[in-house]
Amino acid sequence: ANKKVEGSTPFARSKENFMSDLSEKKCIPCEGGIPSFDINEIHKYLKKVDGWDVKQDESKNFYLIKEFKFENFINSQKFINKVGNIAETEGHHPDIWFGWGYAKIKIFTHAIKGLAESDFILAAKIDKIPNA
């Protein structure tokens, strides 16, 4: 009844399943008092989101950033409206720039001036938007 698939284990997960675990979590509001992720934690979580880059600002604080491409202005606008709806639902608000054919999203936790799990949760939820 139980067939063993070559090269798999009961704990093997596809990247999609690994990401969906994160996208199904809820952002937890941060009022400070917790440390921001260190570079090892950042790299662990970065594997769970698709195409996001980690950068540092002038104060050496880490943030996530990703640019999305679209065919025209209206599709960019529709996308950022969906991002805005997710942000409001989650209570976690990214910085957003958009124009003809693109939208750029920057995510970090303001209260700790760095990255926390909620930032990666929001990134995973944004990645689930159709045509993102």
Question: Which ranges hold each PLM region?
Answer:
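Long, contiguous binding/interaction regions
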Residues: 19-74, 81-132
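Short, Lys/Arg-enriched N-terminal segments with co-localized hydrophobic residues
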Residues: 10-18
